[in-house]
Amino acid sequence: MTIGVVGRKCGMTRIFTEEGVSIPVTVIEIEPNRVTQFKNEESDGYRAVQVTVGERRASRVSKAQAGHFAKANVAAGRTVMEFRLEEGDYQAGDLINAEIFQAGQLVDVTGQSKGKGFAGTIKRWNFRGQDNTHGNSVSHRVPGSIGQCQTPGRVFKGKKMSGHMGAERVTVQSLEVVRVDAERNLLLVKGAVPGATGGDVIVRPAVKA
């Protein structure tokens, strides 16, 4: 997989083309991604680059992590991410920023969706509600039957039921990079990306481009 970066979702806005067309965009701040380790086929069996982003107090870092960051001579970050690398070499301490992308490029954006707590089947799986009248009593939003009788005598795995909704890893594919602001380390991506404002997102070149 081609190298990507870890950024922070700043929110949504819109920009206008020269023809006056409004384009909804998500603003992603690409803080400098500091390389903490470069893995190669000789020592690790595969090629990858490990990066960290943001800052974290020394008291909040384990001794193992502190030693890892100290060996790379970089400040401790709030998260560590690894990207497979097909070509090119990086050294510990190198910085990766928004300039690796260009306007018009397609990217995949991964983030953690907003948590919605315990949700019923209508909200979680788009089930239709039952009749409001015609003899229905207190069963307007219930899912209905969840299986058969003695055969098979169980509920199949994967059955759509009520449960915790959101707060899971979500990837939106093939979003267009509308603008790259290298001076302010901002990436403007067409459309919406997963997660709440201020959340970490991973931006990679699109696998289906």
From Swiss-Prot:
PROSITE patterns: RIBOSOMAL_L3 (PS00474). One of its GO terms (biological process) is translation. One of its GO terms (molecular function) is structural constituent of ribosome. It comes from the Bacteria. The modification N5-methylglutamine is found at Q150. Keywords: Methylation, Ribonucleoprotein, Ribosomal protein, RNA-binding, rRNA-binding. One of its GO terms (cellular component) is cytosolic large ribosomal subunit. It holds the Pfam family Ribosomal_L3. The keyword rRNA-binding applies. Gene3D superfamilies: 3.30.160.810, Translation factors (2.40.30.10). The keyword Ribosomal protein applies. SUPFAM superfamilies: Translation proteins (SSF50447). Methylated by PrmB. Belongs to the universal ribosomal protein uL3 family. Part of the 50S ribosomal subunit. Forms a cluster with proteins L14 and L19. One of the primary rRNA binding proteins, it binds directly near the 3'-end of the 23S rRNA, where it nucleates assembly of the 50S subunit. NCBIfam families: L3_bact. This is Large ribosomal subunit protein uL3.
